């Protein structure tokens, strides 16, 4: 069975002034996994001791709400996190067991990935700022609030995953983002 080690330091501060409320949080953490993959009773430091997938050493979040008057509220959320860990592809190799050679048109058909150290790389840092405005109102006699929100105001490209294309020579990597700037509204 795998064992896990973690160390963590967290800070949370709640704000409460006249019209401004919210909180600020910071966490510094380290999560490691240790597993005997080949069941030989020996842990190989370079392959069987690695950062957990959810290891994000730095995490900062701030949430603010400002009450303009009895009807209108402004809100802001700021997030900064270290990038999530992943196992990087460091090369490609022909998988001779499947077929010796496919064709001259597609010579890279039976290539597979050569992986680096398990969870030894990190995606770029995750940065996001959201803004919102809400107005108290009634809809069909029911109390509520109409809200407009801009998610990812800075339109920062937060990488969700990498996709490796071995059909190209040299191999190409393409990054996929979570979402661009999005404007939402609702009641």
Role assignments for model-derived ranges:
Residues 16-18, 53-56, 67, 71, ...:
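Context-gated lysine
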Residues 4-86:
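Gram-negative outer-membrane beta-barrel transporters
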Residues 4, 45-51, 116-120, 170-175:
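Extracellular loop and loop/strand-boundary signature of outer-membrane beta-barrel proteins
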């Amino acid at each position: 069975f795998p064992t896990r080690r973690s160390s963590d330091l967290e800070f949370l501060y709640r704000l409460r002034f006249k019209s401004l409320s919210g909180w600020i949080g910071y966490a510094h953490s380290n999560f490691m996994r240790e597993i005997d993959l080949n069941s030989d009773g020996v842990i190989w430091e370079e392959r069987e001791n690695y950062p957990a997938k959810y290891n994000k050493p730095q995490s900062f979040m701030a949430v603010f709400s400002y009450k303009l008057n009895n009807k209108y509220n402004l809100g802001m959320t700021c997030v900064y996190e270290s990038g999530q860990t992943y196992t990087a592809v460091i090369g490609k190799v022909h998988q001779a067991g499947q077929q010796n050679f496919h064709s001259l048109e597609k010579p890279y058909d039976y290539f597979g990935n050569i992986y680096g150290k398990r969870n030894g790389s990190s995606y770029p840092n995750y940065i996001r700022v959201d803004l919102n405005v809400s107005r108290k109102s009634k809809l069909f006699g029911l109390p509520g609030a109409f809200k407009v929100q801009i998610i990812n105001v800075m339109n920062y490209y937060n990488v969700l995953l990498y996709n490796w294309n071995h059909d190209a020579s040299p191999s190409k990597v393409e990054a996929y983002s979570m979402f661009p700037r999005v404007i939402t509204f609702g009641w």
